[in-house]
Amino acid sequence: MPNHDLTAEQVRDLRALAGAIIPPSATYGVPGADDEKIFSDILRSLGRDRDDICRALAHLARLAGGAFADLGPERSAQVAVNFREVGGTPLAALVRVVLLCYYRDDRVMRSLGQEPRPPFPKGHVVEQGDWSLLDPVRARPRMYRSVD
C-alpha cells in the first residue's frame, strides 16, 4: 500500500464508509467503492484532501463510539446518516475522493455505456439540448468588470 498516513483503523473505517457511500450493485454489475482496486485508488488519491479526510474519519469514529468498521449493519447505517448531516467540509472532501476514484474505474464506466478511455483525442459526443434554457443567464447584467 502507498504511504497514505492513515492508521490501520482509519483505513478500515474509510473502506467501510466508501462501501456505504457506493455499495455494489448486482443489477448494474458494478463493484462498490470498497472494491480492492477502487479502494487502492482512493488511498493513492488522498493528496491535498488528506487532512480533511483524517478529520472526517476522526469525527466518524467519535460518532460511532469507536471503529465504524466494527459496527453492525443497522448501527453503521444510523451513524452514516448522522455523519452525512454533520460531516461538513471534511466529509465533502472524503466523498469527492471516493466519487472521483469510483468513476475512474473501467468497470463502472462500461456499466454507464462509456468507453473507458480519456476524453481526448477522440472526444465524447454530447447530446444537444435546449439552448433557450440559457436565455435567463444571457439576459442578466454583467457580473464582471471589463478589462478595456
Where are these regions (language model features)?
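Mature-region segments of soluble proteins
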Residues: 12-20, 35-45, 50-148
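Immediate post-signal-peptide N-terminus of mature secreted/exported proteins
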Residues: 2-27
